[in-house]
């Protein structure tokens, strides 16, 4: 029986209603497929990134073998350590004429320093005169030439104006500033106490010139690998004594983490030693009733100390080329208990690359004779005084040495 024409027309021409229920399965299917593709791509990219890191981590040998280190939380940068811009008041001297004038000494108004290319120079007024070279040329201050050219670090004036110099690679020297005559007192590489001198750093001399106290920062690392020494936290730094009469070298203290700057106490019965990696200053007793002992003079400094020098107030100037900002972030503090990250970093990057990430914050503090902080001078971005290694006071001015900057800085203390 045939359907009525009207009913058939309505069925054939009935409008199709498109509902959400009809499209949802198709939409969900597309989403699931896209999600799977995204996860596959993500896993693939992750594998491409992680696989090389795993290869680096397990197959490449790290140049350092870091030790677990425990540092206290850095002190707040407030009070005596309150940030300021006082180091920016300094004047740059002999820009691009002096590279890396690490340490400074004066005899009267004559200023002496050593440079990155192995020279000992005299500064008189506006002139620079080379008085001696400790190593052998060619000397361009490069990493490759440092061991043969020499790298003068600590410098002091002894009796009668004689200069005493600590060279990182070549040892201890006595230099006649008039004739330029050089005398090697202790050779680097010499075996002392069963270990070689590998990184002779700073020194001080008794008033009579009989004893020279000096630091050997490490028997494992050389100066050109100083960041390796800091990051590894190697405890092989030493304090030694050289007797100018008997010519004997004696180990006074060992197991220091980066023994750096050294300064005789006024009574000459003890020396202050910067233990750089630990952000503190130790006091080593070199004579008297406490000879052979050691205690902590200042702990938990706001930066990593380099050279220590007397101030006119009877206290001490301490230079720091890297700080431990609080509030803020200190990479060395963060990594101190993560030796595996240190190993990975040194597998991937060279020291020169890593130094580009070290903030150029320079800090100089003046300590009382008791070790309490008196005042501090800052250059938060190293805009004027960068990589400060020493603060040497003379005639109302503070001369600022640097282990890598191509200039010397001079700060008028009456203006700060």
UniProtKB/Swiss-Prot annotation:
Molecular function, one GO term: arylesterase activity
Tagged with keyword Cell inner membrane: no
Pfam families, per database record: SSL_N, Str_synth
Entry keywords, A to Z: Glycoprotein, Membrane, Signal-anchor, Transmembrane, Transmembrane helix
Extracellular side: 61-412
Main location: membrane
Glycan attachment residues as annotated in the record: 160
Entry membrane topology: Single-pass type II membrane protein
InterPro entries: 6-blade_b-propeller_TolB-like (IPR011042), Strictosidine_synth_cons-reg (IPR018119)
Family listed: Belongs to the strictosidine synthase family.
Transmembrane segments: 40-60
Protein location: Membrane
Protein name according to UniProt: Adipocyte plasma membrane-associated protein
Cytoplasmic side, ranges: 1-39
Lineage of source species: Eukaryota, Metazoa, Chordata, Craniata, Vertebrata
One term under GO cellular component: endomembrane system
């Amino acid at each position: 029986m045939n359907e009525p024409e009207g009913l058939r027309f309505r069925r054939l021409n009935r409008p199709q209603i498109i509902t959400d229920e009809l499209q949802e399965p198709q939409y969900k299917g597309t989403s699931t497929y896209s999600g799977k593709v995204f996860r596959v791509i993500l896993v693939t990219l992750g594998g491409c990134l992680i696989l090389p890191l795993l290869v680096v981590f397990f197959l490449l040998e790290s140049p350092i073998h870091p030790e677990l280190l425990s540092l206290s939380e850095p002190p707040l940068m407030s009070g005596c350590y309150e940030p300021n811009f006082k180091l920016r008041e300094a004047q740059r001297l002999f820009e691009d004429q002096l590279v890396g004038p690490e340490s400074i000494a004066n005899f009267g108004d004559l200023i002496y320093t050593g440079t990155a290319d192995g020279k000992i120079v005299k500064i008189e007024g506006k002139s620079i005169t080379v008085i001696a070279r400790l190593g052998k040329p060619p000397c361009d201050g490069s990493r490759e030439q440092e061991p043969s050219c020499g790298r003068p670090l600590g410098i002091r004036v002894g009796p009668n104006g004689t200069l005493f110099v600590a060279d990182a690679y070549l040892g201890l020297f006595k230099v006649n500033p008039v004739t330029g005559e050089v005398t090697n007192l202790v050779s680097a590489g010499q075996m002392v106490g069963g270990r070689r001198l590998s990184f002779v750093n700073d020194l001080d001399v008794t008033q009579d010139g009989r004893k020279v106290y000096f630091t050997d920062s490490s028997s494992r690392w050389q100066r050109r690998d100083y960041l390796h020494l800091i990051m590894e936290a190697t405890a092989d730094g030493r304090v030694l004594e050289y007797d100018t009469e008997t010519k004997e070298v004696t180990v006074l203290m060992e197991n220091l983490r980066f023994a750096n700057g050294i300064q005789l106490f006024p009574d000459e019965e003890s020396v202050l030693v910067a233990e750089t990696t630990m952000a503190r200053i130790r006091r080593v007793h070199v004579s008297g009733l406490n000879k052979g002992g050691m205690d902590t003079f200042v702990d938990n400094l706001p930066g990593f100390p380099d050279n220590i020098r007397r101030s006119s107030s009877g206290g001490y100037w301490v230079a720091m080329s890297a700080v431990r900002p609080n509030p803020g972030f200190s990479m060395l503090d963060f990594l101190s208990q993560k030796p595996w990250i240190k190993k990975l970093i040194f597998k991937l990057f060279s020291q020169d690359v890593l130094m580009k990430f070290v903030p150029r914050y320079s800090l100089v503090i003046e300590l009382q004779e008791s070790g309490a902080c008196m005042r501090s001078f800052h250059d938060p971005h190293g805009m004027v005084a960068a990589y400060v290694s020493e603060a040497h006071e003379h005639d109302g001015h503070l001369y600022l040495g640097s282990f890598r900057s191509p200039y010397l800085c001079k700060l008028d203390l009456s203006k700060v």
